Amino acid sequence: MTDDLNKVWPSGLTVAEAEEVHKQLILGTRVFGGMALIAHFLAAAATPWLG
């Protein structure tokens, strides 16, 4: 087994592949955070003991 200098340890992805995965992970985190923010706002608005 030879070492591929284009691969990043320990994932075995290339730098471009790792950057693409990271970009999608950040996007997913932002979408999840936005949905959570909306859900928390709706829960706060709908519960009488908080308002």
Swiss-Prot record:
SUPFAM superfamilies xref list: Light-harvesting complex subunits
Transmembrane regions listed in the UniProt entry: 24-46
PROSITE patterns the UniProt entry points to: ANTENNA_COMP_BETA
Quaternary context: The core complex is formed by different alpha and beta chains, binding bacteriochlorophyll molecules, and arranged most probably in tetrameric structures disposed around the reaction center. The non-pigmented gamma chains may constitute additional components.
UniProt cross-references to Gene3D superfamilies, sorted A to Z: 1.20.5.250
Record InterPro entries: Antenna_a/b, Antenna_beta_CS, Antenna_beta_dom_sf, LHB-1/5, Light-harvesting_complex
Gene: pucB
One GO term describing the cellular component: plasma membrane
Protein name per its UniProtKB record: Light-harvesting protein B-800/850 beta chain
Annotated family: Belongs to the antenna complex beta subunit family.
Entry keyword set: Antenna complex, Bacteriochlorophyll, Cell inner membrane, Cell membrane, Chlorophyll, Chromophore, Light-harvesting polypeptide, Magnesium, Membrane, Metal-binding, Transmembrane, Transmembrane helix
Membrane-related topology note: Single-pass type II membrane protein
